[in-house]
Swiss-Prot record:
Acylated-acyl carrier protein (acyl-ACP) acts as a very tightly bound cofactor necessary for the production and stability of active WaaP kinase. InterPro entries: Kinase-like_dom_sf (IPR011009), Lsacc_core_hep_kinase_RfaP (IPR017172). The gene is waaP. Disruption phenotype: Lack of viability. WaaP depletion causes gross changes in cell morphology and leads to the accumulation of an aberrant LPS lacking several core sugars and all core phosphates. The aberrant LPS fails to reach the outer membrane. Down-regulation of native WaaP expression also increases the cells susceptibility to EDTA. Changing residue 191 to A: Loss of activity, cannot complement a deletion mutant. Its cofactor is Mg(2+). Its EC number is 2.7.1.235, 2.7.10.2. This is Lipopolysaccharide core heptose(I) kinase WaaP. It catalyses: an L-alpha-D-Hep-(1->3)-L-alpha-D-Hep-(1->5)-[alpha-Kdo-(2->4)]-alpha-Kdo-(2->6)-lipid A + ATP = an L-alpha-D-Hep-(1->3)-4-O-phospho-L-alpha-D-Hep-(1->5)-[alpha-Kdo-(2->4)]-alpha-Kdo-(2->6)-lipid A + ADP + H(+); L-tyrosyl-[protein] + ATP = O-phospho-L-tyrosyl-[protein] + ADP + H(+). Disulfide bonds: none annotated.
Amino acid sequence: MRLVLEEPFKRLWNGRDPFEAVEALQGKVYRELEGRRTLRTEVDGRGYFVKIHRGIGWGEIAKNLLTAKLPVLGARQEWQAIRRLHEAGVATMTAVAYGERGSDPARQHSFIVTEELAPTVDLEVFSQDWRERPPPPRLKRALVEAVARMVGDMHRAGVNHRDCYICHFLLHTDKPVSADDFRLSVIDLHRAQTRDATPKRWRNKDLAALYFSALDIGLTRRDKLRFLRTYFRRPLREILRDEAGLLAWMERKAEKLYERKQRYGDLL
């Protein structure tokens, strides 16, 4: 069994079974799936997000593997990713409770509780009208570079997101947002993978997903080149020469994802 409790849950759950206590938490349920529940709760006026994972069974695990999908078996992936990103200086959530019980991955019970990041707006919402009403050029440049740095630092730290879309980057709005003063945090790491080094295959999947998610916000060629230069931390001439295969693949992959979105909506 693994268990880490910080305040206020260390105090609230003192003398209680934390796996029963977390199941008893009340709040707004955001997702209820077989084997996983996500909700927002409040303690002492402060918001927290709770993800509870219950064993999905060997049948579901096998079905995922047969369809080339890596199943999410518990909260450990998000816990490990959050810890690694904090070590690397990448702004993300803060976990205040984590528990894992059971060695059988098909029946394991686990949970993670993170502090709510608020007030915030995700970049998909923030940029949704950029085509019609472009943002100040300096702000757009600053945001493009900030996302590129975050994703680059994340990958160099050995973490790949697997859901690397602009909606999973939160812009903090506790004060006016400007090119010279803003904060971003990356969230929703329940599918993230953490290794000593990020394999190119998974790095490339993240980059293609990010590019796809930004296709409709009016980015120019110059914006895209700025992202590449910041992400790779190399001269553009070298990037365009050495990463030509990746860039062509990203275009094709993003186009396929975009076509699927047009056909099926958000059910990718």
